Amino acid sequence: MKKIIILTILGAVFLSFIIYQCFYHERVQIVALGDGIATGETYYDVTGYSFNDYLRDYFEETKQIDEYIKEFADKKETSETLKMKLLNNYILESTDTKIQQALHEASFITIATGTYELNHPKLTTKEINNYLKNMNKIISLLRVYNDKTIVLLSLYPFRYLEKEEVKEINESLKNLCTEKNIYFVDITNIVNNNAYFFNKDTPYPNYKGHRYIKDEIVKAVFD
């Protein structure tokens, strides 16, 4: 009788362990980094629903969300300011959360930066090179802090950011991502659909554009 009880208890413990492991591996902690694309900046200078928010919704439907941190992103973020945030272990005052800790604990990290920094009429080759140099450092640091899923969005051409410039920049970014085993998600085709933008005067997508970006990320990572 005692043997049966012991076996029953061991079986229950083992089953609980299996169930715990299944649910544990399904839990997701998302950290979003970047500029106005990451925050959901709109033509009306207000923050809307971003692709990160749509990703959060996607994970809520398919997995369990532990945490979603989007406050590290800033609509005027540049590669330089993001790099310094990482190096200086920037702290969110609202929650007293350190960025390195948040990144270390994250299971899914997204980065979208470069549109605010590079899309202006006096863009120089030096600025592009500085951007790529900073992105190299950022990507390297992220891999130091985290060994799980990291997604970097491509740039796309718009007004001052010419198609050929974007192509060269994206090729460099893609190579950096390949070296560090990071997902590089190409969203350059977003500019081929006017329905994805508020109007022709803004580089920021509307909610349809952000849904498109979310879908491209899901396809790249999970398909």
Model-derived features: where do they sit?
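Conserved SGNH/GDSL esterase-like catalytic core that processes O-acyl groups on lipids
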Residues: 29-31, 39-125
